[in-house]
Curated annotation (Swiss-Prot):
Membrane-spanning ranges: 3-22, 26-46, 70-90, 93-115
Protein name in the entry: UPF0716 protein YtzA
Gene name of the record: ytzA
Membrane association type: Multi-pass membrane protein
Any one Gene Ontology cellular component term annotated for this protein: plasma membrane
Lineage of origin: Bacteria, Bacillati, Bacillota, Bacilli, Bacillales
């Protein structure tokens, strides 16, 4: 319940505050253009990296390897691309962290921990 409160009340309020602060600091037009630009860059980066991960999954499957790492990368890239396309600066920062391979390495253990927790609650099954 606390997570939903943060997601739907606190997070948008912080995003609006940052938007208003930057609008006053650099102007409304540059702020809006920056948000549009990050959305376009996010979509392009997610498409490029997503295609690379798709081919890596296929290659791993051809060699009989489990593509777990590539699938985790693909999930991070998908979520990162979505976050970059959403308007807001915190969501852009989180999306960029998921798209940059160096910082994605920090996020994947959190993703695996969350997935393992869901599998223990019988919400998903990991084989």
């Amino acid at each position: 319940m606390r997570f939903l409160f943060l997601l739907f009340i606190v997070f948008p309020a912080i995003e609006i505050g940052i938007f208003l602060f930057l609008g006053n600091l650099i102007g409304i037009l540059p702020t809006v253009l920056f948000m549009i630009l990050t959305g376009i860059i996010g979509a392009a980066a997610a498409k490029k990296q997503g295609t690379e991960v798709y081919y890596k999954v296929q290659r791993d499957l051809q060699y009989g390897k489990m593509p777990g790492e590539a699938i985790a990368d693909g999930l991070c890239i998908f979520i990162g691309g979505l976050l970059l396309m959403l308007p807001g600066f915190l969501s852009d920062l989180a999306g960029a962290c998921l798209l940059i391979p160096f910082t994605r390495g920090w996020c994947k253990p959190i993703l695996f921990k969350w997935l393992r927790g869901m599998s223990k609650n019988k919400r998903i099954i990991i084989k």
